[in-house]
Curated annotation (Swiss-Prot):
Organs and tissues of expression: Expressed in lung, kidney, liver, pancreas, placenta, but not in heart and skeletal muscle.
GO biological process: apoptotic process; autophagy; cardiac left ventricle morphogenesis; connective tissue replacement; energy reserve metabolic process; lung development; post-embryonic development; TOR signaling
Pfam families documented for this protein: FAM176 (PF14851)
Name the record gives this protein: Protein eva-1 homolog A
Length: 152
C-alpha cells in the first residue's frame, strides 16, 4: 500500500522546512511586528494564567465555605423543627462563644510536655539571643562624619 503524495514523510519534512523558512523570512523582514506578536502572546498567556489562578482560588474558597453553611442551615432547620416551643436560637453568638472557648483552651494548653523540652527550648532561645548579639556587635560602625581613610 502506498501513501498519498501529500502524506509521505518527505513531503511532511519539506513542509516543515518550508514553514520554518517562511517564519524566518517574516521575522527578518518585519522585526517590529514579530516582536509585537511575541510580546502580545506572552501578555495574553500571563492574563489567562492569572484569570485561571483567580478562578481556582475563588472556587476553592467557595467550596470550603459551602459545606459549613449547608451544615449550619441543616442544623438550624432541624433545631427549628424540634425546638419550636423554645424559640429561635442565636447561632451567631453560639458560634462566637465556641470560638472563644476554643481560643481559651489553646491559651491554657501546655506546649511543652516535659521539663526537658522546656529546658531545650530555653537554651535554644538563649543561643539565638547570643548569636544575634554577636552579629549586631560584630558589624562595623560607619558614621557619616568620620573619614573612611584610616591614615590621617
Amino acid at each position: 500500500m502506498r501513501l498519498p503524495l501529500s502524506h509521505s514523510p518527505e513531503h511532511v519534512e519539506m513542509a516543515l522546512l518550508s514553514n520554518i523558512l517562511a517564519a524566518y523570512s517574516f521575522v527578518s523582514e518585519n522585526p517590529e511586528r514579530a516582536a509585537l506578536y511575541f510580546v502580545s502572546g506572552v501578555c495574553i498567556g500571563l492574563v489567562l494564567t492569572l484569570a485561571a489562578l483567580v478562578i481556582r482560588i475563588s472556587c476553592h474558597t467557595d467550596c470550603r465555605r459551602r459545606p459549613g453553611k449547608k451544615f449550619l442551615q441543616d442544623r438550624e432547620s432541624s433545631s427549628d423543627s424540634s425546638d419550636s416551643e423554645d424559640g429561635s436560637e442565636d447561632t451567631v453568638s453560639d458560634l462566637s462563644v465556641r470560638r472563644h472557648r476554643r481560643f481559651e483552651r489553646t491559651l491554657n494548653k501546655n506546649v511543652f510536655t516535659s521539663a526537658e523540652e522546656l529546658e531545650r527550648a530555653q537554651r535554644l532561645e538563649e543561643r539565638e539571643r547570643i548569636i544575634r548579639e554577636i552579629w549586631m556587635n560584630g558589624q562595623p560602625e560607619v558614621p557619616g562624619t568620620r573619614s573612611l581613610n584610616r591614615y590621617y
